[in-house]
A protein has these predicted regions:
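Alpha-helical protein-protein interaction modules
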Residues: 1-158
Length: 158
């Protein structure tokens, strides 16, 4: 539910929902991930980093958790850390079916739209789950003609 609230740009509600979820199960990695996303969109970067790190701590590394952590690093200007995670994910992308979109997310945070679109198009060719494109983190690409074309090809609203 918190994920849907974030997509709707209802970040305060997403924080509340995530906190309720984590009250029921403090070790629920997805709850920490969703709380991290909401915090990031509220520009509460330190809290977002803590939540993504907690998600990684309780469940191990995953492309989703690692890429969201790298996205926050990128937004904060911690480019070396973000790029290191991106390169690690790039090296493993053949074993991870959603890696392309996760890598693209990092490049969005870095402000590199060309690399973001390169990875999103690779994801499209690999038949990735396009729901990630609804996330607010991809808002900086919404005016890009290539991104609009990708959404059209997928059948998502532009």
């Amino acid at each position: 539910m918190a994920d849907t609230l974030c997509i709707a740009h209802l970040f305060d509600e997403a924080v509340q929902q995530s906190k309720k979820t984590l009250q029921m199960d403090p070790n629920f990695a997805i709850g920490h991930y969703e709380l991290g996303q909401a915090f990031e969109q509220k520009h509460m970067h330190d809290q977002a980093i803590a939540e993504f790190q907690k998600a990684i701590e309780v469940s191990g590394h995953s492309g989703v958790f690692d890429s969201n952590l790298a996205y926050v690093y990128a937004v904060l200007g911690r480019k070396e850390e973000a790029i290191k995670i991106a390169k690690d994910l790039e090296a493993q992308h053949d074993q991870n079916p959603s890696a392309e979109a996760n890598i693209a997310l990092i490049y969005v945070g870095l402000g590199d739209q060309d690399q973001a679109m390169l990875w999103l198009n690779r994801g499209y060719e690999a038949r990735f789950n396009p729901s990630i494109l609804l996330r607010p983190a991809f808002d900086p690409l919404r005016s890009d003609a290539q991104f609009k074309d990708l959404l059209r090809r997928i059948g998502l609203p532009r």
